[in-house]
């Protein structure tokens, strides 16, 4: 049986080992060293203890990525409380529901969230703490009020001759099955569930990253945190892995627009990049593809002798756009556009596509860029098993199942959902459909809930149709829905490009109809679109930038 060490002991060891190293920077702001983080953790432990927080109590966090968020999260775990990270992009009503459902005792909030929420809607909370300076937004107990008012005094009394590394001693989880955090799903299917992740899941994800990716990372290497830390993809691979490895994490404390991200890449020059497809696709489509459409470039790319050299030069330029210092870019969280992937593969760009789920904290599949099979999402990750429920897994898609220490304990207060997701043998049923080749590479076809049934009984995977549609002229993104036995394409045009081209609304409509005809010309009869509709606004998305499909299929 696998021996799993204490995760909190790893946090403690990393702090002691890297005491004077830079670890957390708010981009264009403050930088904390490990000893600064340790002091903040200790102060929060004193606050928790003196305000009556018990081991196992729930502490929620909701705010943009920041060093203060990271310290509050680490303090929660190492105190023995259960963290409840909440995506700051959730609506106030969603935040109230999660805080109330999780039985949270305290809530840490960022500056924006603090102005949007109403404490009366969360009656069981004992207090709301302001993340930037840990001041109290709300206190419902005298103990909490007193503890915060006298926090510096109590810290000084406990450590009269300065706080040193020998003082660092954290709560160690009693067993790997102990609950570490509850992470509420992004709500892609319209219903958010509380995923209970044990310490073994945090350890297993961190051990995978340190073992497989960590051999290319050195102490002091830099990483930019782009994804929300309240999402397990960002939490595991842009924060916890790096913190345990002695790396330096930069937080984009503002909304990470493409311009801000591009500037941060140039300034920080990260060693590893974790991204959702949308970020990569926007940079490639806006910064790279237009340069390849000139007559000169088209001519050069069609000359076999020169083609290789041109692709190498293009690869250099694309690599430079991402800082020029990374070992590889790991893409995950949503489907990757095939046109963009084909381009990156052709120029020899160092990328790979992984696969995961909140319920696995998150990793399920991964392959290093050097062994990555194009179009796949890699093989079963370290510590995990993966199988396809299909009579012919190589050719007939079936549900993807996974088993291993990453898998959740269950859904908080939802035994029915837990039984539906985890079978008696411990396999987690992902709800995703895919195939697996002889080498173990997994190819995702779509969500089983999204699969459409054609009039002739043929299975239709809308994600595959959308990938093709989104590569057509002037289409920024798309969703395919079914009305009766008809398929309809909802297309959101690239209005920026249309403006540059001087197109009128009627021109855009004509182009979209032409796209439909061109699409149908190369598709089998059961997958053809009977109509297209223009979606004026961008499709609403989850924080990991996958479209909330359920909003458009009703």
Q: Which sequence ranges carry the predicted segments?
A:
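Conserved C-terminal "lid"/linker of ANL adenylate-forming enzymes
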Residues: 452, 477, 485, 516-554
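Conserved AMP-binding/adenylate-forming
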Residues: 30, 46-90, 226
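Conserved ATP-binding/catalytic segment of the ANL
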Residues: 380, 394-395, 399-454
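Conserved pre-ATP/AMP-binding loop-to-beta segment of ANL
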Residues: 148-184, 191, 216-222
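Conserved AMP-binding A3 loop
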Residues: 33-35, 171, 180-206
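Conserved AMP-binding/adenylation subdomain of ANL enzymes
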Residues: 203-222, 232-316, 325, 350
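AMP-dependent adenylate-forming
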Residues: 10-33, 189
């Amino acid at each position: 049986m696998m021996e799993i060490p204490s995760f909190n002991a790893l946090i403690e060891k990393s702090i002691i080992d890297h005491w004077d190293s830079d670890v957390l920077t708010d981009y264009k702001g403050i930088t904390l060293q490990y000893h600064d983080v340790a002091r903040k953790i200790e102060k929060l432990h004193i606050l928790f203890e003196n305000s009556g927080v018990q081991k196992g109590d729930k502490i929620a966090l909701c705010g943009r990525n920041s060093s203060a968020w990271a310290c509050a999260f680490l303090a929660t775990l190492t105190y023995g409380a259960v963290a409840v990270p909440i995506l700051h992009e959730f609506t106030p009503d969603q935040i109230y529901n999660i805080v109330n459902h999780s039985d949270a005792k305290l809530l840490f909030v960022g500056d924006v969230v603090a102005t949007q929420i109403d404490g009366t809607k969360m009656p069981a909370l004992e207090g709301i703490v302001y993340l930037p300076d840990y001041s109290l937004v709300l206190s419902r107990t005298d103990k909490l009020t007193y503890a915060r008012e006298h926090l510096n005094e109590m810290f000084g009394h406990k450590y009269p001759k300065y706080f040193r590394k020998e003082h660092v001693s954290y709560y160690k989880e009693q067993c790997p099955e102990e609950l570490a955090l509850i992470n509420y799903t992004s709500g892609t299917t319209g219903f958010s569930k509380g995923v209970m992740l044990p310490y073994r899941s945090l350890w297993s994800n961190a051990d995978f990253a340190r073992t497989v990716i960590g051999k290319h990372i050195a102490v002091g290497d830099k990483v930019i945190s782009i994804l929300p830390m309240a999402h397990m993809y960002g939490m595991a691979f842009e924060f916890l892995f790096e913190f345990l490895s002695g790396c330096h994490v930069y937080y984009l404390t503002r909304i990470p627009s493409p311009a801000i991200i591009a500037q941060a890449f140039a300034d920080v020059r990260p060693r590893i990049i974790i991204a959702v497809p949308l970020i990569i696709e926007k940079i490639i489509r806006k910064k790279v593809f237009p340069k390849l459409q000139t007559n000169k470039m088209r001519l050069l790319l069609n000359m076999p002798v020169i083609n290789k050299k041109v692709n190498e030069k293009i690869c250099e330029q694309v690599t430079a756009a991402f800082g020029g210092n990374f070992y590889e870019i790991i893409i995950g969280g949503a489907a990757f556009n095939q046109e963009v992937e084909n381009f990156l593969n052709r120029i020899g760009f160092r990328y790979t596509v992984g696969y995961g789920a909140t319920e696995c904290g998150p990793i399920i599949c991964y392959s290093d860029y050097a062994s990555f099979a194009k179009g796949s999402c890699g093989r079963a990750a370290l510590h995990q098993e993966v199988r396809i429920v299909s009579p012919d897994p190589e050719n007939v898609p079936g549900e993807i199942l996974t088993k291993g220490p990453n898998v959740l304990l269950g859904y908080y207060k939802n035994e029915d959902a837990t039984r539906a997701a985890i079978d008696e043998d411990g396999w987690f049923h992902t709800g995703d459909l895919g195939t697996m080749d002889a080498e173990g590479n997994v190819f995702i076809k779509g969500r089983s809930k999204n699969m459409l049934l054609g009039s002739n009984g043929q299975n239709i995977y809308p994600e595959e149709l959308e990938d093709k549609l989104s590569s057509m002229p002037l289409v920024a993104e798309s969703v395919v829905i079914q009305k009766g036995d008809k398929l309809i394409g909802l297309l959101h045009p690239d209005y920026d490009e249309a403006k540059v081209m001087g197109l009128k609304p009627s021109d855009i409509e004509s182009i979209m109809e032409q796209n439909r005809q061109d699409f149908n010309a190369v598709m089998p009869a059961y997958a053809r679109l009977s109509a297209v509709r223009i979606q004026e606004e961008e499709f609403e998305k989850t924080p990991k930038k996958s479209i909330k499909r359920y909003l458009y299929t009703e």
